[in-house]
Amino acid sequence: MDPDKRAKLVAMEVEETPPPQPPPPPAKPLPPRALAFLDGPTDEHRVAGLLLLAAADASSLQAHASEIAAKLEASNFLARLLKTAGDDGAALTSAQRAGLEVARALAGTSDDVRDALAKGSALEACGACVLSVADARTMAARGDSIEGGSNEDAAAALRCLDALVGGDPRRLVTSGVDGAPLLAFCRDADEQLWPAATSLLRCCCAGGGLDDESVRALTLLATTVRSKSETYAREAPLIECLALAVAARAGAARTSSTAAHARKAARDVVEEAVPRLLRRGGAREVCRDAALGAAAVCASGRRGAAWLWGRDGAVVRVVAGCAAAEARLALDEALALAAGSGGDDRQRRADRCARVAPLCLGVLERVLRLLLGDDESGDESDDSEAPDAPAPAPDAVLGCRDAVRDAADAALGFCGEARLQRDAAARGLPEAPAPAALELLLALCRPSLSLLGLLAAELDEDEADDGDGDGDGLALHARLAELRPFVDDLVAADRGAAPPPPPATTGDDDSAPSSEVDSDDEIDYGT
């Protein structure tokens, strides 16, 4: 080959290093005298301070979040301001909206600030504000009010409460908001209410805050949103809420009672919808996550086993295949974030990885236990009337096997990369990930190793490591043996002991411990 042509081809194959991400813009200072106004002698001074803070940059609020939260709690002004919101059907004032926006922004800065606001009186005041706005909307619907309860008022109150609650059902109970007003907000066609209202409803359902009448209303809502194109995408989040509500309210109930009929109708709707939602093409990320969450709830318990193996194995093939694909995508996304990719939504993407990967790996672990006949949740009293699981169809077993092996291969590769990133950070190398990214990687190693440990414990080396013939070359035991020191470090870290320093090299080394592991060795991979 011509040397010049060869040089050009080689140059084309050289991977170019992507340009570094531009540094974040410096935080803008708070408006002059904003903090001084919060310490003012009158409420008029504090209102002026809130209005200035509401117009401030988010980064500047984050830099002074603890100080602002302490000032607001010391004067109790924010709680007094919000408790009067929406009285007698009146609209929110500009000061009340500013208070809601500032509280929401402060709660999103850190868990410590959110805890400080939630432990104070701001949480109850925000809950009272949501209820007042809901009452004002009811009055406006009856024609008793013409200005209160607007969509803007409702959106501001719901977003603030969602930020203060932070997904904790106990905080939602403390706020005084139950399922009835949240269901009313979810019925509204306005899209600006939907994200916060659904998030709060999910939290309420997970905490058992919906009574049987509300469960029946949610069932009706979840079945009717499909009929309209503008609400078609709302089905998956509502199905997830319904699955959580039924699971939280599971318990003894007379077969002929209204409660039993409501729960059975809700379960039937959820179990029919989940496979269809998982197969839905072009679904948005939030809809896929909601469908996976509902699938995880449905797969639990004795009833979950019967549901998974139903329809001649069609359900379990869909659930296992989607869980394996989403687990691989989430693990790859976490590695990409550790490598420095991403933009303004890095934190959102990291939060999704931390939520989706363990969820999907847990679903696959449940499927694997059912395949192995190791069902640990088959004696639940609330599933006493659950149908017996049918015998799994052979093609369903093969589909589950392929899905579990695909996820195991992704988990093995992820744990190996996480070990290399951990070693790079320990040596202070320039390519080491940021501390937050490394913490995410190590956190995701635990559910990954839990699945791998179960698979390694149940399969012998011929089944798991066959790379010839019709095998897939997973090499499970050999690759886990290479990760054994890394696993020991994770176990030591979980137990509070300082892990030993990483080895001097990360590649193949003749001086490294032997990777041969006897089958009788007891290795804790997180199971």
Language model features with spans:
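Long C-terminal extensions of eukaryotic subunits of large macromolecular complexes
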Residues: 2-5, 9, 14, 28, ...
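Elongated alpha-helical scaffolds that mediate protein-protein interactions in large eukaryotic proteins
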Residues: 13, 22-180, 186-196, 203-220, ...
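Extended acidic/polar regulatory tracts at the flanks of large eukaryotic scaffold/adaptor proteins
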Residues: 253, 284-290, 300-358, 363, ...
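Long terminal accessory regions outside catalytic cores
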Residues: 266, 270-280
